């Protein structure tokens, strides 16, 4: 999924006091402070502070440090008036005196009035244009232009200083207004909108529930159960261990959370070096590969799963081997580099780890079980996956209320506080972009594009592979959503080669550029890695893994080879 870290909206560096990165001692804290002078956004852009973003689990790292960092973590003393009753730093602590002075010195009310008038004029112009008779007569062209303008605004969000969630919502509403004007009747447009809203809401509810569960587990430091068991200091061994731990962690969690957890770990284990950056690149590749082979591992596979293009067991069985190959090939190639073949890490350089929250193991077990139980719930009841995730959230909510009853100092460990930390603006962007794509589907535009591709590129493997490459540059959510609208289940049935390749390619293709996935963006911010370093050091390995994974998938299907799913199917155990 593409991210464009274009521009920054901070005061000039020479007028700001440089902030030092607060390095948490925890190997797994998602609240690791990111460098404030690195601007990057994935799906929801926020100016003025560094933020992570990836659909449902987006802008957390910067916000959570404000609630989890103690005043002693900062380089400069903090005014006691800026602290709450619990001693935690108020968000206003992040505004230093030089930046406040810069704001006061450069505040110009006239400029704000001009901006407001410009936005009002643009809104009135848009309203007049939509009501023009040309729009009704040329619905397809009008909607294509609107979508192109809106998508350009999303891509260049940082340059325009507009949040892409707002742009997405405006684009969605505008497209449906045009659709209602051009439809045979308003009633037909309303029915189409109701159908689209029902489908999109399932995904949004699922993501909100999953985000909250992960947030609760993280608040209890539950991921330490995984990361504390990584004790090796040998560079080559650590490379493979970090890669495959991230791979399996990402198959259950989202790839953003997995990346922050694992990058925080390697910052604890390895001092600042080229080798540590390379380990971070491995985390990005592994997080994207791990999310591609399970229905809950990546937002695009979740979309395909919820809408019925793929199912649980066939997807896991058919995509597991290609996903492993897409990770193993880069790991094997990286093992030959000089950075990996260095000396063993000195144990004295390892940072101390902070303690797990009370009942952290219990919360980790229940939270992980709630996520894994969702496919089982769907298979047992036939109900949509979001009902399963809401069931798990409800159980975890009651559990945390019970185990922290009467503990006023542990309110941050409860669900209401977790809900305040998850990124709802990312969910709103997701709502906007999917409603926008559904309007194009309702108007028949996506079907026309599909017919054009079928006529000119009849090879479905090539189409899926191209989507993966493009997803390294352009957001893969609208890409996959558009593909779902272009091809229905009558063209390609559930679990067909096309849909499985789409799931794999869209999930792993983003590893080829650091801005191509939320995992890469998180790594870029946490380790101060720039686009060109990643392109020189990691992109080639990621592309090799991507191509090898596609080749492995096609080879398995063309040779009709099946991965054994039971003991009886393993030849050397059955004597066959």
Swiss-Prot record:
Tissue specificity remark: Mostly expressed in mature and senescent leaves, and, to a lower extent, in seeds, roots, shoots, flowers and developing siliques.
Q: Where is the transit peptide?
A: 1-60
The record's keywords, sorted A to Z, are: Antiport, Chloroplast, Ion transport, Membrane, Plastid, Sodium, Sodium transport, Transit peptide, Transmembrane, Transmembrane helix, Transport
User: What Gene Ontology molecular function terms does this protein carry?
Assistant: antiporter activity; pyruvate transmembrane transporter activity
Q: What happens when the gene is disrupted?
A: Decreased biomasses and lower chlorophyll levels after sodium feeding. Increased Na(+) levels in chloroplasts in high sodium chloride conditions but impaired photosynthetic performance. Altered levels of phenylalanine and tyrosine.
Q: Which GO terms describe its biological process?
A: pyruvate transport; response to salt stress; sodium ion transport
| UniProt main location, coarse | plastid
Source species, domain of life: Eukaryota
Q: Extract the Pfam families matched here.
A: CitMHS
Give the UniProt subcellular location, in the record's own words: Plastid, Chloroplast membrane; Plastid, Chloroplast envelope
Q: Where are the transmembrane segments?
A: 237-257, 279-299, 320-340, 357-377, 379-399, 426-446, 462-482, 501-521, 541-561
Q: How does it sit in the membrane?
A: Multi-pass membrane protein
Q: Name one GO cellular component term.
A: chloroplast envelope
State its role.
Na(+)/H(+) antiporter that extrudes sodium in exchange for external protons.
Q: Which family does it belong to?
A: Belongs to the NhaD Na(+)/H(+) (TC 2.A.62) antiporter family.
**Protein name as catalogued:** Sodium/proton antiporter 1
Give the source species.
Arabidopsis thaliana
Q: What is the lineage of its organism?
A: Eukaryota, Viridiplantae, Streptophyta, Embryophyta, Tracheophyta
């Amino acid at each position: 999924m593409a991210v464009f870290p274009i521009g920054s909206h901070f005061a000039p560096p020479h007028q700001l006091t440089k902030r030092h990165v607060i390095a948490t001692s925890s190997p797994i804290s998602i609240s690791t402070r990111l460098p404030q002078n690195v601007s990057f956004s994935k799906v929801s852009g926020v100016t003025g502070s560094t933020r992570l973003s990836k659909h449902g689990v987006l802008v957390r790292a910067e916000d959570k440090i404000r609630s989890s960092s103690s005043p002693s973590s900062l380089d400069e003393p903090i005014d006691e008036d800026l602290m709450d009753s619990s001693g935690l730093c108020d968000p206003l602590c992040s505004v230093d005196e030089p930046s406040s002075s810069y704001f006061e010195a450069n505040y110009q009310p006239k400029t704000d009035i001009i901006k407001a008038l410009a936005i009002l004029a643009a809104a009135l112009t848009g309203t007049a244009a939509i009501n023009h008779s040309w729009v009704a007569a040329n619905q397809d062209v009008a909607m294509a232009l609107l979508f192109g303008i809106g998508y350009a605004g999303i891509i260049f969000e940082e340059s325009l200083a507009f949040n892409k969630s707002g742009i997405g919502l405006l684009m969605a509403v505008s497209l449906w207004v045009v659709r209602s004007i051009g439809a045979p009747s308003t009633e037909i447009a309303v029915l189409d909108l109701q159908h689209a809203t029902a489908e999109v809401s399932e995904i949004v509810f699922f993501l909100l529930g999953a985000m909250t569960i992960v947030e609760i587990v993280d608040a209890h430091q539950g991921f330490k159960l995984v990361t504390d068991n990584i004790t090796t200091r040998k560079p080559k061994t650590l490379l493979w261990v970090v890669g495959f731990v991230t791979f399996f962690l990402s198959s259950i969690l989202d790839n953003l959370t997995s990346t922050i957890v694992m990058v925080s770990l390697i910052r604890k284990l390895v001092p600042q070096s080229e080798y540590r950056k390379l380990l971070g690149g491995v985390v990005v590749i592994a997080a994207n590969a791990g999310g591609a082979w399970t229905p809950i591992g990546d937002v695009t596979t979740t979309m395909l799963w919820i809408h019925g293009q793929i199912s649980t067991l066939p997807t896991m069985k058919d995509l597991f081997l290609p996903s492993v190959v897409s990770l193993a090939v880069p790991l094997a190639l990286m093992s030959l580099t000089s950075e990996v073949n260095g000396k063993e890490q000195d144990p004295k350089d390892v940072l101390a780890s902070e303690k797990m929250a009370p009942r952290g193991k219990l919360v980790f077990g229940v939270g992980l079980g709630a996520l894994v139980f969702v496919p089982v719930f769907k298979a047992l009841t036939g109900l949509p996956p979001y009902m399963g995730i809401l069931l798990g959230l409800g159980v975890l909510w009651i559990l945390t209320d019970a185990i922290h009853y009467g503990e006023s100092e542990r309110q941050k460990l409860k669900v209401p506080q977790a809900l305040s930390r998850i990124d709802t603006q990312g969910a709103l962007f997701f709502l906007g972009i999917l409603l926008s794509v559904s309007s194009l589907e309702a108007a028949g535009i996506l079907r026309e594009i599909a017919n054009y591709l079928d006529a000119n590129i009849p090879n479905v493997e090539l189409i899926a592979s191209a989507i993966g490459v493009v997803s390294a540059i352009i957001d893969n959510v609208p890409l996959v959503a558009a593909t779902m609208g272009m091809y229905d289940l009558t063209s390609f049935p559930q679990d067909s080669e096309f849909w499985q390749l789409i799931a794999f390619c869209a999930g792993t293709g983003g590893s080829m550029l650091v801005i191509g996935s939320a995992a890469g963006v998180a790594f870029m911010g946490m380790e101060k890695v720039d686009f060109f370093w990643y392109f020189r050091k990691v992109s080639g390995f990621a592309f090799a893994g991507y191509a090898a994974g596609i080749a492995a998938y096609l080879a398995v299907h063309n040779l009709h080879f099946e991965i054994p799913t039971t003991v009886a199917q393993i030849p050397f155990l059955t004597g066959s």
